[in-house]
């Protein structure tokens, strides 16, 4: 039996690899890109319309689905066009991870080197011994050990970079150490970061746009899709192998450390048994996007900038725009809602209106003293749970919400003033957010 399972697993891998070698790669520029008919994929027009209407309601500016390298669906909203530029926010982290791998492959740097080798001693406010423990690898995996309780999450001045724990002792989504990877690459290669991006990636995959401005990458939507297609092709663009180092490529898109299963080298990973999210040290059970394929990995940015890569479906999905709901870093509730619709485009499957969709959750008043009202957009069909955690990750309140209503009044008791994390677990997944107690 075990032998049969192993054979089936190897066959699935073989089929996935074969599909990815048959990818179409568009020529350079922003004009020519072959398309594939949604009808040929068995997608229902009614469900496509539902998806596109939902995206419009959620402040989307552009949306693309790439299937087998070809455009299956492309939509722009308002005055935004295929020639408009938009920011990637933290989705640009994943591009930096790729560029770091290229710099290592060229012999310019080693991610296991101390960051001080490239930035010099004193790039932090730590002792030389503490600072010396931080490797480029720790910057890629969000495990630098630096104190994230700062006024400005993006401040890279040494005075902002203080010791909290040894490098590798915890995971926390902290921007400043990541931003300094750009400086590491510039120091190691002797090349301006924009120039390095242009010569190593942008020109080679035919991007018509792309520029770093104050550590944030901007491009056209199709160029974001090109990067997703490069990743889907395992670092190969047509006949040009940009990344030969398969070990580094695989490390980028697999669990990188012991704390957050759902994080690789600046890439978010679906299909894991637990996850940690930006802004908290809590470990949540379950995958980050339950409605998406388990093998999906993603470049995710603030205000719902998304580049999803799905090897099993030979698919890349890109969304750019303003925040769909709350303004959150990287992962948001929008991910799961979007994939509830993308995953049900096929006419032969169950439509999103027939499946369990995550209701919209509101908590008010926020800030509050000791009473909260939680409201759902639709009545609960099954019992749910709300939990409240302090910023140390301690559970300070929990209650079962019985099905049948969409509004619940909660008395959370007397709690110290501060910011708390709430988690609402429904049968469709979970929603997280912040609430302030005065």
Residue positions per predicted region:
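Bacterial Sec-dependent N-terminal signal peptides
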Residues: 1-21, 352, 394, 410, ...
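C-terminal outer-membrane/trafficking sorting elements
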Residues: 6, 356-438
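Residue-level detector of functionally pivotal "anchor" positions at catalytic/ligand-binding pockets or at interdomain
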Residues: 20-35, 346-364, 377-379, 394
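A short, well-structured edge-of-sheet supersecondary motif
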Residues: 51-80, 308, 314-318
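Active-site SXXK
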Residues: 69, 86-112, 139, 181-185, ...
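Catalytic-site signature segments of enzymes, centered on catalytic residues
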Residues: 82, 145-219
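Active-site helix/loop module of the DD-peptidase/beta-lactamase fold
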Residues: 106-144, 191-223
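Penicillin-binding protein/beta-lactamase superfamily catalytic region
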Residues: 165, 202-311, 324-329
